[in-house]
Amino acid sequence: MTNIRKTHPLMKIINHSFIDLPTPSNISSWWNFGSLLGICLVLQILTGLFLAMHYTSDTTTAFSSVTHICRDVNYGWFIRYLHANGASMFFICLYIHVGRGIYYGSFTSMETWNVGIILLFTVMATAFMGYVLPWGQMSFWGATVITNLLSAIPYIGTTLVEWIWGGFSVDKPTLTRFFAFHFILPFIIVALVMVHLLFLHETGSNNPTGLNSNADKIPFHPYYTTKDILGVLLLILFLISLVLFAPDLLGDPDNYTPANPLITPPHIKPEWYFLFAYAILRSIPNKLGGVLALITSILTLTLLPYLYTSKLRSLMFRPLTQLCYWMLVSDIMILTWIGAQPVEYPFITIGQVASILYFTIIIILMPMSTMLEDKMLNWN
């Protein structure tokens, strides 16, 4: 008798995706982060669902309802901090996942890469709207500042902002629609993840060498399921430690003050995972220029398949481009630090230099080093 997982229409899909999937035998732990992102997504949807049962999306009661969750609901504080810090874990895994994709040349699988970029934008939008929901000071002012950026769009900007706000300022209609979008977007993300996996399984996984691995594949289960469990345990250990010992480490103290349109916080800043993009936005004195730089900072990922045309897919054997890559990683860390600093000397200058360097490395230095390496290997 044939195994049911190989014959049943539904089980067959799961079998081909997670059990009998032919996987390169040499993929390293950097390939763990895809499954970790799946775990994070499930965790966020579950904790979010329980939070939504007690949350009210009304400006007068939103802040109180979050306080009520933490004080009166059984393990409400735990669910709330799991959700808040789970978002941080999500972005850590997401950035490592994208970084691995750049390092090992995964962007040559164009469809998978482009769906991944759409996923990145969707997750960022979801996280931004989630940050507005507790209706603290930073929630309110963050929403005001970021949505206001759309007013830089010529002709339709102001109308667009008022349409998103549902009035002439961030108020009850804004909070209600942000809650609605924050609830529905994770399910759209799940659908996009399925498309992402569909395209990935069309071509098969990349591997650290960047070479074709068709001659050396092993089944995903039990080898990589076991390997992924280690990553999952480490992720859970780190997340639970954060939730139980330092739940507010990555948050902003200003968000423990109820939203007040009459008092502006001294430093308006988003969550830590958006700080690098926020630093690029702030480093340009012009509003429209800043918005364009902000969007371009992530959209440059779509250019990678066209910019890096080396004969070698992976950076494993390319020391010059490796140097540029780690310069880029360092630069993003500097931008993250700058985004959290006040707008004053020397932070403005450091931010501007780091922003110029960010685009220079991606658009000029890395493609040039790629061409130079090909030249040195007499491949061009």
UniProtKB/Swiss-Prot annotation:
<keyword id="KW-0349">Heme</keyword>
<feature type="binding site" description="axial binding residue">
    <location>
        <position position="182"/>
    </location>
    <ligand>
        <name>heme b b562</name>
    </ligand>
</feature>
<feature type="transmembrane region" description="Helical">
    <location>
        <begin position="347"/>
        <end position="367"/>
    </location>
</feature>
<dbReference type="GO" id="GO:0045275">
    <property type="term" value="C:respiratory chain complex III"/>
</dbReference>
<comment type="function">
    <text>Component of the ubiquinol-cytochrome c reductase complex (complex III or cytochrome b-c1 complex) that is part of the mitochondrial respiratory chain. The b-c1 complex mediates electron transfer from ubiquinol to cytochrome c. Contributes to the generation of a proton gradient across the mitochondrial membrane that is then used for ATP synthesis.</text>
</comment>
<feature type="transmembrane region" description="Helical">
    <location>
        <begin position="33"/>
        <end position="53"/>
    </location>
</feature>
<dbReference type="GO" id="GO:0006122">
    <property type="term" value="P:mitochondrial electron transport, ubiquinol to cytochrome c"/>
</dbReference>
<keyword id="KW-0999">Mitochondrion inner membrane</keyword>
<dbReference type="InterPro" id="IPR048259">
    <property type="entry name" value="Cytochrome_b_N_euk/bac"/>
</dbReference>
<feature type="binding site" description="axial binding residue">
    <location>
        <position position="83"/>
    </location>
    <ligand>
        <name>heme b b562</name>
    </ligand>
</feature>
<dbReference type="GO" id="GO:0008121">
    <property type="term" value="F:ubiquinol-cytochrome-c reductase activity"/>
</dbReference>
<feature type="binding site" description="axial binding residue">
    <location>
        <position position="196"/>
    </location>
    <ligand>
        <name>heme b b566</name>
    </ligand>
</feature>
<feature type="binding site" description="axial binding residue">
    <location>
        <position position="97"/>
    </location>
    <ligand>
        <name>heme b b566</name>
    </ligand>
</feature>
<feature type="transmembrane region" description="Helical">
    <location>
        <begin position="226"/>
        <end position="246"/>
    </location>
</feature>
<keyword id="KW-1133">Transmembrane helix</keyword>
<keyword id="KW-0679">Respiratory chain</keyword>
<dbReference type="InterPro" id="IPR005798">
    <property type="entry name" value="Cyt_b/b6_C"/>
</dbReference>
<comment type="subunit">
    <text>The cytochrome bc1 complex contains 11 subunits: 3 respiratory subunits (MT-CYB, CYC1 and UQCRFS1), 2 core proteins (UQCRC1 and UQCRC2) and 6 low-molecular weight proteins (UQCRH/QCR6, UQCRB/QCR7, UQCRQ/QCR8, UQCR10/QCR9, UQCR11/QCR10 and a cleavage product of UQCRFS1). This cytochrome bc1 complex then forms a dimer.</text>
</comment>
<dbReference type="Pfam" id="PF00033">
    <property type="entry name" value="Cytochrome_B"/>
</dbReference>
<feature type="binding site">
    <location>
        <position position="201"/>
    </location>
    <ligand>
        <name>a ubiquinone</name>
    </ligand>
</feature>
<dbReference type="InterPro" id="IPR048260">
    <property type="entry name" value="Cytochrome_b_C_euk/bac"/>
</dbReference>
<feature type="transmembrane region" description="Helical">
    <location>
        <begin position="320"/>
        <end position="340"/>
    </location>
</feature>
<dbReference type="InterPro" id="IPR016174">
    <property type="entry name" value="Di-haem_cyt_TM"/>
</dbReference>
<keyword id="KW-0472">Membrane</keyword>
<dbReference type="GO" id="GO:0005743">
    <property type="term" value="C:mitochondrial inner membrane"/>
</dbReference>
<comment type="similarity">
    <text>Belongs to the cytochrome b family.</text>
</comment>
<protein>
    <recommendedName>
        <fullName>Cytochrome b</fullName>
    </recommendedName>
</protein>
<keyword id="KW-0479">Metal-binding</keyword>
<dbReference type="InterPro" id="IPR005797">
    <property type="entry name" value="Cyt_b/b6_N"/>
</dbReference>
<dbReference type="GO" id="GO:0046872">
    <property type="term" value="F:metal ion binding"/>
</dbReference>
<keyword id="KW-0830">Ubiquinone</keyword>
<dbReference type="Pfam" id="PF00032">
    <property type="entry name" value="Cytochrom_B_C"/>
</dbReference>
<keyword id="KW-0812">Transmembrane</keyword>
<dbReference type="InterPro" id="IPR027387">
    <property type="entry name" value="Cytb/b6-like_sf"/>
</dbReference>
<feature type="transmembrane region" description="Helical">
    <location>
        <begin position="113"/>
        <end position="133"/>
    </location>
</feature>
<keyword id="KW-0408">Iron</keyword>
<keyword id="KW-0249">Electron transport</keyword>
<feature type="transmembrane region" description="Helical">
    <location>
        <begin position="288"/>
        <end position="308"/>
    </location>
</feature>
<dbReference type="InterPro" id="IPR030689">
    <property type="entry name" value="Cytochrome_b"/>
</dbReference>
<feature type="transmembrane region" description="Helical">
    <location>
        <begin position="77"/>
        <end position="98"/>
    </location>
</feature>
<dbReference type="InterPro" id="IPR036150">
    <property type="entry name" value="Cyt_b/b6_C_sf"/>
</dbReference>
<feature type="transmembrane region" description="Helical">
    <location>
        <begin position="178"/>
        <end position="198"/>
    </location>
</feature>
